[in-house]
From Swiss-Prot:
Lineage of the species this protein comes from: Bacteria, Bacillati, Actinomycetota, Actinomycetes, Mycobacteriales
Protein name: 4,5:9,10-diseco-3-hydroxy-5,9,17-trioxoandrosta-1(10),2-diene-4-oate hydrolase
Classification via NCBIfam families: hydroxlase_HsaD
SUPFAM superfamilies found in the cross-reference section: alpha/beta-Hydrolases
Species name: Rhodococcus jostii (strain RHA1)
Documented EC number(s): 3.7.1.17
Length: 292
């Protein structure tokens, strides 16, 4: 662990912002002196949060960027409303309000994993003048399974936890997330289960899932509008991703005008953790590249 990692803790970076009368968001902030802001958006698995997804990435990115790692609505220490529009719209608009509340103007880069990748794309589509470059890891809503069965193994296990929220079902879900099974420790399982099994978290997760079949569900089908993205987009996929399999990248790669794709072998759905050093270099180089 580096000196920087030791200095940046959950407590030292933890902040709250009241972005609407009935919505308070929790986020982690680091690299405050840097000019360029990057927003990190976590995935949607049970017990997920910005810290659980990005704790080790935050110090590295904070060396170059002003980092805002946001607990999306319904997750972490953020409020957990159960009445909201399609979830990507819900999260993207909440992020816009957070940036306004914090006085962060101009464009921000967005780095999103899974559900967070979908929210990042929705933000870029709905607020194009506020979005810089996008780094998307196995993004939800953008991937279309051309060959893999649907629902995928990961989505099936996510639903199983929703119906029967036990520690055993959570462990089964988490093990699908990664290629390297050593990453799924008892400590991680216990931590995620404690966060996921509260009544508020379970209700929020149910509302999030329901929003993908509500009247405005088509707003979650991001691949339909992918051609509208004018930002540079880096798609990152794990070859062994069992949540949003690799073949799901092909439609996005074809439709997004300025997209590029990087595939990690020996990697599941959590590229930012399984390929930590390579991921950080790849994302940083992409975001700092001076090309248009």
């Amino acid at each position: 662990m580096t000196t920087t990692e030791e200095a940046l803790t959950f407590e030292s970076t933890s902040k709250f912002a009241q972005v609407r009368p009935h919505l308070k968001l929790h986020y982690h902030e680091a690299g405050v002196g840097n000019d360029t802001t990057i927003v990190l958006l976590h995935g949607g698995g049970p017990g997920a949060s910005s810290w659980s997804n990005f704790a080790r990435n935050i110090p590295v990115l904070a060396e170059k960027f002003h980092v805002l790692a946001v607990d999306q609505p319904g997750y972490g220490l953020s409020d957990k409303p159960t009445e909201h529009p399609q979830y990507f719209v819900h999260s993207a608009s909440a992020l816009k309000d957070l940036l306004d509340t914090l006085g962060v103007g101009g464009r921000v880069h967005l780095l999103g994993n899974s559900l967070g990748g979908g929210a990042a794309v929705r933000f870029a589509l709905d607020y194009p003048d506020r979005a810089g470059r996008l780094v998307l890891m196995g993004p939800g809503g953008l991937s279309v399974n051309l060959f893999a069965p649907d629902p995928t193994e990961g989505v099936k296990n996510l639903g199983k936890f929703g119906y029967q929220p036990t520690r055993e079902n959570l462990e089964a879900f988490l093990r699908i997330m990664v290629f390297d099974q050593k990453l799924i420790t008892d400590e991680l399982i216990d931590e995620r289960f404690a966060a996921a099994s509260t009544p508020e978290s379970l209700a929020a997760a149910k509302a999030m899932g329901k929003s993908f079949s509500s009247a405005d569900f088509e707003l979650g089908m991001l691949w339909r509008d992918a051609y509208k993205l004018r930002q540079r987009v880096l798609l990152i996929w794990g070859r062994e991703d069992r949540v949003n399999p690799l073949d799901g990248a092909l439609v996005a790669l074809k439709m997004i005008p300025r997209a590029q794709l990087h595939v990690f072998g020996g990697c599941g759905h959590w590229a930012q953790l399984e390929k930590f050093d390579e991921f950080n270099r790849l994302a940083t180089d992409f975001l700092l590249d001076g090309g248009k």
